[in-house]
């Protein structure tokens, strides 16, 4: 692909604007709270779009499109089952604890609820996960620039890292949040025309489903395997995802989704930056409204790509293969951009892709520098320093967080679908963590010793499950089977779901067991940290759309209707 001058101008203006926001906000970064939490001054709608956009990284755009090509419409489970219910739960039940406790991070809340060792364990595991997640976005960006512009992969990765480093170093979380709002609108503007052109080329939704019928039957599945969500979930072998309904509901819908959306500081940080408790509770609910529509923006392009690639006709393009002979699903979006967009629109589409990658990188790096500075450096390395010292350490953490992310980008190249890699990371870190939070917030008997033992055991259970299982067609190694292959899963996704279920179950069981034989904290120390001991926020006199419970119920109702519509 050879972008024209207008394409380069569009991308150049975007990069200049992004860095300009960082420069403009630099003079407001006077304290560590300004830098790490935006001074808790962000309006609900801005924080809501940033909450959504922080998750619109490589896993959302490249990863979901890849999963759309690989698994079909069933990928929408990551939204309608694996995101919306958890986002509603966060806003209605969990934000009062996060925001009301005045904790500066999720690990700090764990310290307040449990003890220092539980906070330290979570801080280290979370910092590691954010580095890998940021690395995935860098890998995707390097892949894109290498494919579409012909740039060397190494150069592409380091260039993208330098740009993200620039605006976070200058403007901190505030710069990241306002850039994420800009990136949200760019992503919608860039990909909506792509879906329209792709569907028009295939003869509309009916033409797409007819092509997908051929895709499904050619691989030995029922005709609707790629175009339905639930109808083929009765047995793992009857759908390309290789997962039965229980794995979707329990593994994705409960453990992985609640573990990510309710405990991952990357997204929770945006809500904690809101200007009030009421605004903080509405942030994930505001984000849930556009979130439920995103399958049509990012999954459908992948379905169009596999339909066109398998049954070439009007489209005339095919997904390339990796060196191991597998289809490179991660190139679904780039290949469609190259095929459908003329010059000018191509610049907009490329800018939308770049925006999504930079959003994902920035979200992870801002979460990393906060957790490193507050929960590792201040807690264990240098206590009692001035606020200015921690502000400077946050900037230093931004630099080495970016450097570690670059290293993680090269690890991501071992997966032919980056969504599979990310679900594996979440299974190791977020799945056991959600069990800890669930017990900590809703069971006052849970103790610090129980939480610590549960987190360690849950992560160990995830590692053991991964070491003893493998997905069909995967080589022994990073994808599993390190010790032995006792069970073979139909797909990597199924393996990841059951890894998460194992981690959650073991963590929950061990935490309860150890808590019952150790001394709990006095109830007076748990006020504001446990549901039964915390006063309920008053919602009297507010319209329904400003009341989290009513807004959450409306969001869940629409989501349920979408599940039935594409059953």
PLM regions and their residue ranges:
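Membrane-embedded helix-loop-helix hairpins and adjacent transmembrane boundary segments
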Residues: 1-567
């Amino acid at each position: 692909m050879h972008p024209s001058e207008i394409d380069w101008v569009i991308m150049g203006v975007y990069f200049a604007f992004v860095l300009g926001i960082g420069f403009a906000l630099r003079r407001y970064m006077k304290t560590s709270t300004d830098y790490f939490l935006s001074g808790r001054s962000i309006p609900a709608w801005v924080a809501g779009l940033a909450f959504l956009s922080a998750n619109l990284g490589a896993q959302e755009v490249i990863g979901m499109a890849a999963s759309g090509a690989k698994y079909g419409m069933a990928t929408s489970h990551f939204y309608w089952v694996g995101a919306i219910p958890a986002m509603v739960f966060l806003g209605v039940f969990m934000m009062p604890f996060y925001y009301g406790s005045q904790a500066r991070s999720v690990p700090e809340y764990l310290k307040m609820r449990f003890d220092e060792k539980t906070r330290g364990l979570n801080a280290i595991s979370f910092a590691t996960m954010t580095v890998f997640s940021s690395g995935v976005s860098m890998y995707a960006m390097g892949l894109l620039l290498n494919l579409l512009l012909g740039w060397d992969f190494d150069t592409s990765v380091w260039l993208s890292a330098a740009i993200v480093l620039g605006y976070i170093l200058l403007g901190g979380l505030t710069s990241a949040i306002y850039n994420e709002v800009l990136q949200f609108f760019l992503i919608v503007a860039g990909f909506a025309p792509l879906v329209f052109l792709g569907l028009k080329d295939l003869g509309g939704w009916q033409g797409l489903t007819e092509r997908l019928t051929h895709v499904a039957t050619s691989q030995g599945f029922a005709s609707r395997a790629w175009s339905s969500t639930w109808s083929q979930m009765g047995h793992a072998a009857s759908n390309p995802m290789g997962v039965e309904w229980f794995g979707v509901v329990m593994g994705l819908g409960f453990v992985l989704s609640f573990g990510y959306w309710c405990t991952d500081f990357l997204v929770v940080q945006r809500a904690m930056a809101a200007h009030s408790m009421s605004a903080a509770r509405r942030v994930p609910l505001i984000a849930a409204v556009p979130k439920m529509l995103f399958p049509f923006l990012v999954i459908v392009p992948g379905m169009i790509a596999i339909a066109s690639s398998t049954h070439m006709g009007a489209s005339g393009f095919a997904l390339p293969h990796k060196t191991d002979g597998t289809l490179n699903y991660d190139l679904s979006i780039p290949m469609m951009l190259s095929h459908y967009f003329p010059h000018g629109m191509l610049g907009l589409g490329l800018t939308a892709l770049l925006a999504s990658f930079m959003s994902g990188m920035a979200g992870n790096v801002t979460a990393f520098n906060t957790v490193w500075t507050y929960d590792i450096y201040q807690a264990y390395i240098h206590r009692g320093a001035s606020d200015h010292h921690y502000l400077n350490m946050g900037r230093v953490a931004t630099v080495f967080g970016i450097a570690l992310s670059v290293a993680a980008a090269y690890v991501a190249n071992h997966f032919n679908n980056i969504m599979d890699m990310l679900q594996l990371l979440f299974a190791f870190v977020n799945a056991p963590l959600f069990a800890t939070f669930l017990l900590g917030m809703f069971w006052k008997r849970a103790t610090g010793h129980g939480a610590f033992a549960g987190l360690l055991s849950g992560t160990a259970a995830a590692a053991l499950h991964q070491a003893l299982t493998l997905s069909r067609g995967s080589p022994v190694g990073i994808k599993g089977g390190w010790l032995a292959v006792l069970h073979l899963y139909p797909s990597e996704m199924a393996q990841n779901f059951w890894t998460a279920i194992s981690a959650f179950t073991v963590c929950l069981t061990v935490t309860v067991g150890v808590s019952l034989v150790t001394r709990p904290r006095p109830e007076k120390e748990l006020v504001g940290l446990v549901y039964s001991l915390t006063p309920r926020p008053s919602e009297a006199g507010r319209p329904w759309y400003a009341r989290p419970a009513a807004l959450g119920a409306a969001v869940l109702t629409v989501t349920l209707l979408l599940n039935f519509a594409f059953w």
